Amino acid sequence: MPKLPIAGDEDWSVLTEPPLLRGLPGFAGKFIPMQQARELYQRVRAAPPGFRLEALLAEMKINFEVQLSDLDRIPVKGPLVAVANHPFGVLDGAALAVLLSRARPDVKILTNSMLESIPELHEHCIFVDPFRHSSSSYKSVDKNVKPLKQAMEWLRQGGALAVFPAGEVSHWNVREAQVTDPSWSDVAARLVRKTGASALPVYFCGHNSARFQLLGLINPRLRTLFLLQEFLQQREKNVRIRIGKAIPSQLIANLEDDEEATEYLRLRTYLLSHRGKKPFSIPTRMRAALPRKPQERIAEEVPSRFVVNDIAALPAERLLIENAEFAVYAARASELPHAIDELGRLREITFRAAGEGTGRSADLDQFDAYYWHLLLWNKEKQELAGAYRAGETDAIIRAHGIKGLYTNTVFRYDEQLFLKIGSALELGRSFVRPEYQRQYAPLLLLWKGIARFVAAHPETPVLFGAVSISNEYSSLSREMIVRYFEQRRVKDEDGREFADLIQARTPFRAPKLRRWDCGALCSLLRDLEELAEPISDLEEDGKGLPILLKQYAKVGGRLVGFNLDRKFSDVVDGLVIVDLRQTDPSVLERYMGKEGYAGFCRFHWLSKGAR
């Protein structure tokens, strides 16, 4: 039978002196501090019931290093299976139980039946026989029926259960050339799927000593022998713990089988080991060592009255949409003699705040002269709150050729691309000022403004442009986003055809993180929302996906290529293509408005409500 997930495995069992120790009295007496262990045990057992695991950690002067935001991720009620890697032994089980109990009182650990002889552990544990290879394996199956039923009943009553699916302590894996858990049992996944419990990934940073790993290579039983000594050497240790977002039971249930669910839980757990990591990359390090060109000082603010006059002078038909607070206008740069300078200044301020930006005093370029500018205007404060830049590809290519498109600076296009997608509207340089980013309404109105612009120009039903993934995201987050869309593009015939006509000028290549298979996790994700959760786990500030990426996905966008923009703070640009004729009708009507949507449908001979 597969080895069951436990806490501590054989760790505490040395206190009951199993045959291995009794058979090696001289060796054990020389290398294993049994007397020290017994004295610790006596002090811990004197603690009040319910506090003995805390007493154990207190006696050892072990401290947790865990972010408060991570502690807030522990569900305070409802059935919960906390899954964790198992790097140390005794320490892991005690630490995880105490950590969970700070958020909720109903915590138990699935642990080794050898520890059942220690009565003080009964209040904390459900005991199972973990061994998979023994002459008594069938007896183990019988012995585990009752405790596993007990575990399921505990979860169905709304309790929390701590599980170490590896079933034994992490050790050196020769094939992977690192210390890691052995393969995980599927028991944790089965408990989640059978009880409807949420799953909580928890990662312990670190591992046991090099001597422990070496002894395990000589004989795995030597690891067991020295687990107690390893624990006693953890005195005054600071244990770094990372907690991921709780995984809804339905997500686990939707995976194909217990094996796939187990793989997902393991990947989500080990993903936490990369939070905040900056992978080693020789080119990146070399660039970092070079003197950087200093950023220019931000341009002076344009006097408000000049900007107000520019907006007031726009023809009435340039108003695309408005609500009580904001209005969205369409204008050419020639109609904005003062406002265009303020627009460039605000762009640069906003992009710099997001770790991007040109480094110039204002973000203005040659494309601004002949592109449309969709302006988000705060009616009460009389100020620009954000903007989009939009260009009709047919007109631009006629006047300037393909090189007249902004995205041609980051992607090389085959002329066949524009024959395939037809008349389109290139979007880019979008921003909402930082002080307006706390609410979603400004960006939503901008998007409605884009839709109204398309409704007024229905001959351009395709949107395309570059959506940025800033370098404020970790390299692994950016790689996961890229890999997710690349995997889906392979399955999308149109996406593959588009990709064949596009070439990134500087292809994005993520620095490799040793022994992490990014594609394995991405292949288990069904939609963009399921990608957002692991991204949030990776990012130290907990941010999810870039909001524009989600917005494009909502209207059916395909990401067909990725480029690293060296001139724009090393952001990753994803080239997105959206055919609004294929967008969900209810979504499109919400953005275009009923009249605009009806006119769009008439122009393209679309039946309302059908794609």
Predicted regions and their residues:
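Membrane-anchoring hydrophobic helices of lipid-metabolizing enzymes
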Residues: 1-86, 93-95, 102-106, 122-123
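Non-catalytic C-terminal accessory region of glycerolipid acyltransferases
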Residues: 2-7, 141-299, 513-522
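Acyl-donor binding region in acyl/amide transferases
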Residues: 348, 358, 394-558, 563-573, ...
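Conserved nucleotide-cofactor-binding alpha/beta core module
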Residues: 107-143
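Glycine-rich phosphate/pyrophosphate-binding loop shared by adenosine-nucleotide-utilizing enzymes
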Residues: 382-387, 425
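Short amphipathic alpha-helix that is part of the acyltransferase structural core
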Residues: 320-373, 377, 385-389
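A short helix-loop-beta-strand connector motif used in the catalytic cores of GNAT acetyltransferases and
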Residues: 366-375, 543-544, 569-574, 587
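Conserved N-terminal entry element of GNAT/NAT acetyltransferase domains
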Residues: 293-334
